[in-house]
A protein has these predicted regions:
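A secondary-structure micro-motif
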Residues: 1-128
Length: 128
């Protein structure tokens, strides 16, 4: 189940639940992946958004087709192509676009909307 901040930005997913607790995986964790989509009128490019842990403060949007339109400041949202996340949850903003290995794909550095400061309140999406 995804969870979001009070203003709708994706924070992560619940990975384990017990009677009294829930374990979460933050979007910055290296084990976190979600389908992402560029939210712009001229482009609906699809890719995979991955966490990168403490080595980077930004996320990586990978596996974007080489011919997709992509630009700095594009909004990245969940694609809805995986059953665990509904479409349209804000993830972050593109800060840099690069060619992937051999020029077959593009990659984007994404600055998450989620603040890395302590989070006091989240919303859990249980039905979509």
């Amino acid at each position: 189940m995804p969870f979001i901040t009070y203003n709708g930005a994706l924070v992560g997913k619940i990975s384990k639940v017990t009677a009294n607790t829930a374990r979460i995986t933050l979007i910055t964790d290296v084990n976190f992946t979600v389908g992402g989509r560029i939210q712009r009128e001229e482009s609906r490019a699809i890719g995979v958004v991955r966490g990168r842990a403490k080595e980077k403060e930004f996320l990586l949007m990978d596996e974007i087709p080489w011919d997709a339109e992509l630009a700095k400041d594009d909004l990245v949202v969940t694609s809805g192509l995986t059953s665990n996340f509904p479409m349209g949850i804000p993830i972050g903003k593109v800060i840099e676009v690069k060619q992937g290995d051999y020029g077959l794909i593009q990659q984007a550095e994404v600055k998450p909307f989620m603040s890395l400061a302590p989070i006091e309140e989240v919303l859990v999406i249980t039905d979509f």
